[in-house]
Structures are given as C-alpha cells and as structure tokens.
C-alpha cells in the first residue's frame, strides 16, 4: 500500500487525465455554438465554416425530380431522430464524464482531509511518530522472538528425525 501523498498525486494525475478526456470529447462531439451574439460576425462565420478535407453531401441526385423529393423527404424525416439520438447520447456521456470527475474530486478531498494539516500541531505529530516508533520496536522484538522460537522448533524437529532414523537403522541390524 502506498502512502497518502503518493495516492493523492496519483488521484490528481487521474483527475487531470479525466479533465483532458472530457474537454477533448466536448470539442470533438459537440455542436458548434455562436461565439458572440451577432450570427454574421467574422468569428461566428469562421467557427461554422466547413472543415477542409471533409466532403459535403451532394445536394443533387443523378435521377429525376421525383427522386429528389423522395430522397429529401427521407433525409428530413430521418435526420431529426438521428440528431435527437446523437444529442441524447452526447448528454449521457457528458453526465457520465461529469460524475467521474466529481467522484475523483471527492476522493482527492478525502485524501487531503486524512493528511495531518493545520489543525495538528507539530508536537502532536512528533508524539504520534514516537508512538509509532515504539509500536514498531515492540513488533520487531516480537518478530525476533518468533524467529528464535522457529529456530528452536526446527532444531527439535531435526533431532527427532535423527533419532527416528537412528532407531530405524539400529532395528535393521
């Protein structure tokens, strides 16, 4: 397990990645909006200009006039439902991304709250460190005792094995 500062750094890195992914998603998938109130301003015209390299759908068909009307009728009737579905999908994705950012922010807040801060005096922090050092010494002593006990049990088992092996070899003679 890592310490709280490392966890905090990892969470902050993840939050930055989430912000970046969210902004990228919005830039890629959202409808362009007006930059100012005048729809005929240069900035709005530039923002709504066609993207170079993207082919526009041809408005003329190769068939007769009646074919144009049926194609136009189909595209008009299919377009609103597709657009509504795309907007719904966009909104759902934005809600998901927003929820992820909120949860990560709360996790960061919890990590920050768990750090010793302004409300903890340096003396109390030193006392806490000293208490932890004493606990560590006690645990280390207990570990050494257990290692010595293990070594004694191992020697006892070895002596039992030697006695059994000696007894078996003497009984065969």
Curated annotation (Swiss-Prot):
Domain of life, source organism: Eukaryota
GO terms for biological process, alphabetical: regulation of transcription by RNA polymerase II
Keyword tags: Activator, Coiled coil, Nucleus, Transcription, Transcription regulation
Keyword Membrane: no
Major localization class: nucleus
Gene Ontology CC terms: mediator complex
Coiled-coil segments: 123-155
Pfam families attached to this UniProt entry: Med21
Chain intervals with Low complexity compositional bias: 50-60
Tagged with keyword Transcription: yes
A molecular function (GO) term: transcription coregulator activity
Protein localization: Nucleus
Subunit description: Component of the Mediator complex.
Record-stated family: Belongs to the Mediator complex subunit 21 family.
Primary role: Component of the Mediator complex, a coactivator involved in the regulated transcription of nearly all RNA polymerase II-dependent genes. Mediator functions as a bridge to convey information from gene-specific regulatory proteins to the basal RNA polymerase II transcription machinery. Mediator is recruited to promoters by direct interactions with regulatory proteins and serves as a scaffold for the assembly of a functional preinitiation complex with RNA polymerase II and the general transcription factors.
Name this protein carries in UniProt: Mediator of RNA polymerase II transcription subunit 21
Gene expressing this chain: SRB7
């Amino acid at each position: 397990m890592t310490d709280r500062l490392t966890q905090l750094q990892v969470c902050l890195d993840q939050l930055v990645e989430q912000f970046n992914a969210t902004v990228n998603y919005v830039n890629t998938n959202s409808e362009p909006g007006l930059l100012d109130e005048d729809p005929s301003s240069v900035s709005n015209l530039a923002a709504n200009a066609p993207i170079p390299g993207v082919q526009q759908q041809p408005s003329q068909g190769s068939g007769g006039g009646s074919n144009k009307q049926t194609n136009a009728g189909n595209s008009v009737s299919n377009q609103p439902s597709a657009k509504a579905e795309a907007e719904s999908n966009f909104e759902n994705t934005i809600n998901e991304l927003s929820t992820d950012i909120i949860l990560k922010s709360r996790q960061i807040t919890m990590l920050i709250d768990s750090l010793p801060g302004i409300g903890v005096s340096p003396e109390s922090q030193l006392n806490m460190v000293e208490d932890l050092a004493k606990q560590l010494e006690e645990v280390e002593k207990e570990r050494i005792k257990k290692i010595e006990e293990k070594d004694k049990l191992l020697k006892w088992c070895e002596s039992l094995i030697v006695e059994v092996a000696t007894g078996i070899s003497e009984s065969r003679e």
